[in-house]
């Protein structure tokens, strides 16, 4: 099941932190971004296997792995060995970068294994809120 939400952005741009997209990609597709994204991106693997290329390094994505990409970081990712299922969120805001840096995300980060329970719960809450905006 693929579910993607790109909220209509209006007055949210004045907020210090705002959602620009959230989704479940099942299956995930081959993505090449030579100039990176304009937004910050968090992505975690909920099933299958994929590959992420940042710079000259390749990172294997398996269930429980996650990565963070700040804006403008060139990257490529694609499924490997069949299906790859991802949960992802993209966001912007004047203070998004500073907030993330204060949390230790001051550049590209990759983790081969995270405890997915809390991130999945948070992701599901954000997805539910984005599905029924109060705008």
Residue ranges and their predicted role:
Residues 1-65, 73, 79-81, 106-110:
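Generic protein-terminus/edge-of-domain signal
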Residues 14, 88-91, 114-118:
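A generic short alpha-helical patch detector that favors 3-5-residue windows
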Residues 18, 41-44, 95, 118-122:
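Amphipathic, well-ordered alpha-helical segments in soluble domains
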Residues 41-44, 66-69, 82-99:
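A short hydrophobic beta-strand segment most commonly corresponding to one strand
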Residues 45-48, 78, 90, 115, ...:
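Alpha-helix boundary/capping detector
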Residues 50-56, 74-75, 83-84, 98-101, ...:
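Short C-terminal domain-edge/linker segments immediately following a structured domain
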Residues 99-135:
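Amphipathic alpha-helical segments enriched in hydrophobic/aromatic residues interleaved with Lys/Arg
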């Amino acid at each position: 099941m693929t579910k993607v939400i790109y909220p209509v952005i209006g007055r949210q741009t004045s907020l210090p932190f705002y959602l620009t997209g959230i989704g479940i990609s099942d299956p995930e597709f081959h993505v090449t971004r030579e100039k990176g994204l304009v937004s910050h991106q968090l992505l975690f693997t909920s099933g299958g296997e994929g590959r992420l290329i940042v710079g000259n390094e390749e990172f294997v994505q398996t269930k429980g792995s996650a990565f963070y990409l700040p804006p403008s970081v060139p990257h490529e990712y694609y499924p490997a060995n069949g299906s790859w299922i991802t949960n992802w969120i993209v966001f912007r805001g004047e203070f998004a970068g500073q907030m993330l840096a204060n949390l230790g995300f001051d550049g590209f980060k990759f983790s081969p294994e995270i405890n997915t329970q809390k991130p999945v719960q948070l992701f599901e809450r954000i997805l539910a809120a984005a599905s029924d905006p109060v705008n």
